[in-house]
A protein has these predicted regions:
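A sequence/structural signal for flexible, mid-protein segments enriched
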Residues: 1-227
Length: 227
C-alpha cells in the first residue's frame, strides 16, 4: 500500500483526482464518476519517498460491453447429461463480437456482493463463441449451457440462496491482460506443493519491476431476478 501519494487519471478530456480515505493506501474520487467505452485512461501516481520523487503510471482502454443482459435464471446445474444438486445462474445475452473481450462475473444476494474483490471473481473468454447469443439454442448445441455463477453452501452446509432472495448478476467487460493478471495472482496464492513454484505476476504499471498491481478501466452491465 502507498500512503500520501498524489493519484490522478487523465483521459484526454478531464483530469480526475483521487483522495486518500481514512484507510491508509486507499484512494477514492470525491464524486461518483462514470467511464466512457473506447476511451483510454491514464493513471499517474506521484510519491515522495526516501528524499526522492517516484512516478508510476499505467493506461487502460475501456472495452465495449454487451448491450444488455436480456434475462437471467437460477436452476440446477446440468453438465454432460447429468444434473447436480447445486444452483447455477444462467444469463441470456448477445455476446460481443470482439474475441479479445473477456468477461468477469460477480453476483450479489440482496445487494450483498458475494466477492468483495474482483480478484476472487471468475473470468471467462468466449473467443471461440464471440458473437453468439449466450445460452441460446445454437450456443447450447455447440458448447452446452454455461452457468456464469454457481452458488455454494454456507459453512453449515446450507444453501446461501433462499426463496424470495434478490439476485443480481454483474457482467464486466475486461481485457485479456487483466484476465491473465487475475489468473497469475490466484496461481500464487496458497501453499499447495502441486501448484509449482511462484512466478512473477503480470502488471501494466510502469516503471517495470518497480510496482505490482494492475490498472483496468472496465465497463459493467447488470441484471436482477427474484429467486
Amino acid at each position: 500500500m502507498i500512503s500520501g501519494a498524489e493519484v490522478f487519471i487523465h483521459d484526454g478530456f478531464d483530469t480526475i483526482y483521487f483522495e486518500e480515505t481514512e484507510q491508509k493506501g486507499h484512494y477514492e474520487t470525491l464524486d461518483p464518476i462514470a467511464g466512457v467505452i473506447g476511451r483510454t485512461y491514464n493513471l499517474n501516481i506521484n510519491i515522495f519517498d526516501n528524499e526522492e520523487m517516484h512516478h508510476y503510471y499505467a493506461k487502460s482502454t475501456m472495452k465495449d460491453n454487451v448491450t444488455q443482459i436480456d434475462s437471467i435464471t437460477i436452476k440446477d446445474v446440468a453438465m454432460g447429461g447429468m444434473q447436480f444438486n447445486i444452483k447455477g445462474l444462467y444469463a441470456y445475452f448477445q455476446s460481443n463480437t470482439d474475441p479479445s473481450v473477456n468477461y468477469l462475473i460477480d453476483a450479489a444476494i440482496n445487494d450483498s456482493l458475494l466477492n468483495e474483490s474482483l480478484l476472487k471473481c471468475a473470468a471467462y473468454s468466449l473467443a471461440g463463441a464471440s458473437g453468439f447469443y449466450v445460452n441460446g439454442p445454437e450456443f447450447i448445441k455447440l458448447f452446452g449451457e454455461l452457468p456464469l455463477h454457481i452458488f455454494g453452501n454456507d459453512k453449515n452446509g446450507n444453501s446461501i440462496l433462499n426463496e424470495g432472495d434478490s439476485v443480481t448478476l454483474y457482467l464486466y467487460s475486461i481485457t485479456q491482460e487483466f484476465s491473465k493478471y487475475i489468473s497469475d495472482v490466484n496461481g500464487n496464492i496458497g501453499s499447495n506443493p502441486m501448484m509449482g513454484m511462484p512466478y512473477n505476476v503480470s502488471t501494466n504499471i510502469y516503471p517495470k519491476g518497480k510496482a505490482v498491481g494492475f490498472f483496468e478501466a472496465a465497463s459493467v452491465v447488470k441484471s436482477t431476478v427474484i429467486y
